[in-house]
């Protein structure tokens, strides 16, 4: 069988399975997710063994420490995948929900009911936990899912998908409901993007190159999980202890994820005190600073920033730092360089916080909190499918409702149109 035929068959099986999934009861779907969670925990040793193969290959390829961290599975992360599935099982099922009914003058009643999208294709890189997270959300929302992970995580993804498919089979549900493209051949992505007869939506998660390739080559609608150029702005009257804590957490806790801070903006009236302070703290934690001229003056040893630094998603212990004239300048900078992911203001000035919330147009805007909270699980959505930076049809962390659409339902008593 050619690669083209293989991908087409895989997508067709997912489409066939989606018709069954759309009718599966909430109880069965919840049992499925809980069973998958138990199965992942039971397979921890085997999953870590397969993940070790990917980590070794990654080291041989020279992947950065941050990228290896994204790739790594340990007991805690496998437990986290299982916990995420259990949390999704506890969430309300959106399928079948009627969102409003109204009566027309002729007596007919019109409403809208949530239904699954059908088949969702997820194309992602590095993080093998996406395999379980995406499967859980898609299946709970009544959708079949076709997964294509990065070649660097192929052993981990195959192992996770195998565990999850085993639970589908045990409950008598169609195996085609969860499909993994098992080849590392990049041509498989191109073929997947041609399956408009069988796949309803593509969600790419990864670097800028992947997102651009998918957007330019897909025949299927795409929701972009674009790069996370997340900004934090420290206002003139910010609590500096709070600002330090937020900035350190946003940059250092997990620098290789999309909700890590990549650019720090500091009000000029706070700069004399805060720039040396945060530079010292971050430097001790191994962060390389790339700053404007004023930052370099206040924090000797800072690397002078170039234009490309302001729009960079480093995914590493590197931070762009700029001193700005005030809130107007901070907002203008963010509007120019933002990827519409997450932006933060640290301030004790209520009017400034409200203006920041109104004028910043990113999918998540925060006041006095770390950008690391920009996550579906942290928002109570359960494990997320991604953080959409596309305003249609979803914006921000995507949960169950974002994997459904609505159809109109009409009740009559024999009315005909005059």
From Swiss-Prot:
SUPFAM superfamilies: ALDH-like
GO molecular function, one term: glutamate-5-semialdehyde dehydrogenase activity
Job of this protein: Catalyzes the NADPH-dependent reduction of L-glutamate 5-phosphate into L-glutamate 5-semialdehyde and phosphate. The product spontaneously undergoes cyclization to form 1-pyrroline-5-carboxylate.
One protein family per Pfam: Aldedh
Gene3D superfamilies given in the database record: Aldehyde Dehydrogenase, Chain A, domain 1, Aldehyde Dehydrogenase, Chain A, domain 2
Name of the top EC class for this enzyme: oxidoreductase
Main location per the UniProt record: cytoplasm
Gene Ontology cellular-component terms listed: cytoplasm
Catalytic activity: L-glutamate 5-semialdehyde + phosphate + NADP(+) = L-glutamyl 5-phosphate + NADPH + H(+)
Protein name per the record: Gamma-glutamyl phosphate reductase
Record-linked NCBIfam families: PRK00197.1, proA
EC number: 1.2.1.41
InterPro entries: Ald_DH/histidinol_DH (IPR016161), Ald_DH_C (IPR016163), Ald_DH_N (IPR016162), Aldehyde_DH_dom (IPR015590), G-glutamylP_reductase_CS (IPR020593), Glu-5-SA_DH (IPR012134), GPR_dom (IPR000965)
Listed GO biological process terms: L-proline biosynthetic process
Protein family per UniProt: Belongs to the gamma-glutamyl phosphate reductase family.
Source organism per UniProt: Syntrophotalea carbinolica (strain DSM 2380 / NBRC 103641 / GraBd1)
Keywords assigned by UniProt, alphabetized: Amino-acid biosynthesis, Cytoplasm, NADP, Oxidoreductase, Proline biosynthesis
Record's subcellular location: Cytoplasm
Pathway listed: Amino-acid biosynthesis; L-proline biosynthesis; L-glutamate 5-semialdehyde from L-glutamate: step 2/2
């Amino acid at each position: 069988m050619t690669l083209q035929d293989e991908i087409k068959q895989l997508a067709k099986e997912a489409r066939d399975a989606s018709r069954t999934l759309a009718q599966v009861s909430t109880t069965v779907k919840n049992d499925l997710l809980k069973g998958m969670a138990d199965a992942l925990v039971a397979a921890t040793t085997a999953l870590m063994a397969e993940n070790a193969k990917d980590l070794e290959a990654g080291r041989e390829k020279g992947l950065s420490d941050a990228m290896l961290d994204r790739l790594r599975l340990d007991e805690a992360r496998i437990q986290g995948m299982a916990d995420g599935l259990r949390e999704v099982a506890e969430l309300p099922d959106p399928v079948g929900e009627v969102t409003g009914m109204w009566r027309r003058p002729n007596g007919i009643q019109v409403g809208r009911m949530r239904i699954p999208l059908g088949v969702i294709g997820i194309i992602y890189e590095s993080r093998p936990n996406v395999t379980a997270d995406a499967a859980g959300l898609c299946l709970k929302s009544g959708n079949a899912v076709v997964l294509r992970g990065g070649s660097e995580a192929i052993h981990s993804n195959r192992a996770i998908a195998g565990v999850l498919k085993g639970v589908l089979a045990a409950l008598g549900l169609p195996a085609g409901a969860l499909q993994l493209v098992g080849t590392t051949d990049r041509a498989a992505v191109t073929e997947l993007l041609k399956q408009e007869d069988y796949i309803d939506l593509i969600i790419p998660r990864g670097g800028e190159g992947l997102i651009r390739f998918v957007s330019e080559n897909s025949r299927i609608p795409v929701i972009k999980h674009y790069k996370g150029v997340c900004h934090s702005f420290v206002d003139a009257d910010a609590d500096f202890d709070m600002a330090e804590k937020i900035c350190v957490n946003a940059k250092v806790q997990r620098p290789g994820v999309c909700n890590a801070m990549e650019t720090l903006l500091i009000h000029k009236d706070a700069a004399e005190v805060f720039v040396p302070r945060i530079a010292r703290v971050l430097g001790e934690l191994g962060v390389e600073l790339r700053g404007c001229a004023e930052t370099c003056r206040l924090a000797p040893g800072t690397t002078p920033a170039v234009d490309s630094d302001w729009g960079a998603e480093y995914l590493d212990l590197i931070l762009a730092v700029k001193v700005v004239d005030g809130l107007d300048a901070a907002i203008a900078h963010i509007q120019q360089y933002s990827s519409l992911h997450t932006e933060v203001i640290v301030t004790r000035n209520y009017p400034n916080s409200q203006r920041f919330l109104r004028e910043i147009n990113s999918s998540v805007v925060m006041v006095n909190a770390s950008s690391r909270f920009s996550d579906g699980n942290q928002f109570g959505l359960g494990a997320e499918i991604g953080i959409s930076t596309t305003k249609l049809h979803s914006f921000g962390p995507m949960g169950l409702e974002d994997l459904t659409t609505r159809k109109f339902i009409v009740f009559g008593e024999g009315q005909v149109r005059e």
